[in-house]
Amino acid sequence: MAASLPLSAAIVGAEESVDKEVLEMEYLFEKFLMPSDLCSNTEWLGIPEEHVRKFGMMLEDRDGYSVIFFQDGVVPGKLWCFRYWKSNGVHGLTKGWRCFVREKGLKAGDTISFFRGSACGRLFICCRLGTHATFASSSTLHHGFSMPPPPARPLVGLQSGMLARDVPSLGQARLHDGNQDGGGAPSRHVPSSGRRVEAQLSRVSSRRQRRTMKHSIPEPTIETPPILESMFLIAAPPAVKCLRLFGVNIYVLPVSSSGQPKQESSP
């Protein structure tokens, strides 16, 4: 998979923090949770066989069972230990999975994803709640990692444990009432994310109202009839003169090629 470059805090709209470690992550796979994965009686998360080898080398607990350690993608420094079990060609995670489901509040329709640190080699697990919950593409976590589409490699910042979609941008974090330099009211910090979004939407709507829509009216065009090369112009014939002499109408025709005018008469 192609590696994604680390993004600065200014790009993702998060405030820069001191001593923040950014780790490049490699996407392994994700699983859409079914009701059978959340059954409290079995405590079993089925893993496709082609994805099991992506976990790498497993450890053994004191009872002799294979276990896999995952670092929580949201809570900094928290580790999850799942017992690996294989039976009749079916692979899955057993002991420890029920506790993870209960703490994260997972339900059928949620998605869990697995990642590996490109440099450290540690495994990470993260969950996505609901079918409509999406993670921002090319985003970062202050502690955990982002959830871009599968082909991308997310980033991990080991500090605060917030998703980039939950971190307000610098422009949304504070609202300024008046002008501080001009004697207005000082800026106040608004902790409510809903009020920040509402303020941002009001600014966008006010800018849209000031915009004037200009509709261009096409000017009428006069089409010129085409002139083909085979066409030639013919002069209009001169008008025929009519004279009445002694009760007889005399028509004077145009001059012929011989130079003599033709005359026709009618009673």
UniProtKB/Swiss-Prot annotation:
Q: Where is the DNA-binding region?
A: 30-131
Name a single GO cellular component.
nucleus
Q: Which UniProt keywords apply?
A: DNA-binding, Nucleus, Transcription, Transcription regulation
Query: Which SUPFAM superfamilies does this chain map to?
Result: DNA-binding pseudobarrel domain
UniProt signal peptide: none
Compartment(s) of residence: Nucleus
| One Pfam family here | B3
GO molecular-function term, one example from the UniProt record = DNA binding
Q: What is this protein called?
A: B3 domain-containing protein Os02g0455800
